[in-house]
Amino acid sequence: MNYATFFSGAGIGCHGLKINGFDCILSNEYLEERIAIQRFNEKCDDEERYIVGDIREPETRKKIESILKQSKDNEGLDVLIATPPCQGISLANHKKTPTEIVRNSLILESILLTKKYQPKYFIYENVLGFLNSACSDSDGYDRGVKEVIDRHLKKNYYIERFIFNLKHFSIPSSRTRTVVVGIRKDLDKHPLSIYPKPEKIVTLKESIGHLKSLKKPREIDPDDSLHFYRPYDERMLPWIENTLEGQSSFDQNDKRRVPNQIIDGVLKVNEAKNGDKYKRQRWDDIGPCIHTRSDTFSSQNTIHPKDNRVFSIRELMILMSIPKTFRWVPKKTKLDTYEEIKKFELNIRKAIGESFPTRYLQLLSKNILEKHLLSQADVEAINKYFLDTQIFKKYSIELQESKPLNVELKETIEKCIFYNRLEKKSANPLKVCIGNNYKETKADIIFSTRKIDNKIPILELEKFYLYQLIDKKNLSLF
């Protein structure tokens, strides 16, 4: 199968499709230094398929349309992926200017290409507030992104959209994202059938605890040149060396060990505007959300749980599920010294911070390749069953061993349970229902581990009831 990807960055997310054998027929990215990384990984088999430039510029658009038209005239486009820039969309920017609204229309370009070339599948990924963000539509009116997607694509596509934290898919860092999946209606497959099922949450200790401890600035692991101790101003060492796991330097009582500066001979403590700055991470927690400035203590959640340093590039790669074989430099380039590494380091860190984790699109694209996906009617029947039964209210019966189920059906049920817990409220994308309760936060989507009287986790009990009761229904999949 083939795919086209827009706003593709360094190709980190869509590398998951390459792993599964998909052919990249087109990769569009604005920055040449990001496309260069894609070339190092041989993302496309033809140089002309790398298109550098603004998708809105006539010359860039002409090249894109030429490739997509050729594909449509031949075997057709299988998958279209779009991950437009999130500046002007992020919840950090509450008040959007007309310029930002136009910038948000970058997603419109992807929507219109989807509409024109009719790929079998489309995948849009963006930040938490993506769906409700204002976007200039093709008729000149400003609409929410969700409405624009439905207006142009709902006629020909089954569409699902969810907001969730990618840590639920064994990606060892916290990254809350909106993922929209559409499947062309003639395929008669429901989008939920290709969304990955939730997996084990992985802690920092489990993911990077095996790597060599680094004690000195510029120290490089002799077995892995991307695992190194990034140097910093030695005056900062007292600020972090006594900081405990989960603690910020600003939590210390000794002012000399709090980030400070000397002004006219007087020590002045820096203002602690953000509790995530100068913060040491915890081994037993999920890894932090990786940002573009992972090179400095003053950015968010960048300090190693044990060593007095920021995370190395290898550690960042693991936290973003980027495989060890992924290349950042040409094959002939040797990264034997820190001086050589330094030439590429910031570009690599920025590329990682901008990216979508490789593993999620690897899981999703693997599901696309499955031949026996559940149909729209099948999944609607399961979802209807959730509504028809009192499954979330029955907590009094004793747990018994459930009846064995077909593996495909079992996984679909698990996905239905997981994704049905994400209540999609147009007025509040941050709300996540846990039974009749919800927690709300700007920083993360919280999934409760609330227990009931018999100490069985609610998720397990929900599975049990569904397994027991679903056999009594005359659903199409039986």
Indicate where each model-derived feature is located.
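C-terminal target-recognition/interaction regions appended to catalytic cores
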Residues: 235-478
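Conserved proline-anchored active-site loop of SAM-dependent methyltransferases
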Residues: 5-14, 75-93, 121-127, 180-182, ...
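Conserved acidic residues
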Residues: 51-59, 163-167
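SAM cofactor-binding core of SAM-dependent methyltransferases
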Residues: 4, 8-12, 16-56
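Class I S-adenosyl-L-methionine
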Residues: 64-74, 87-277
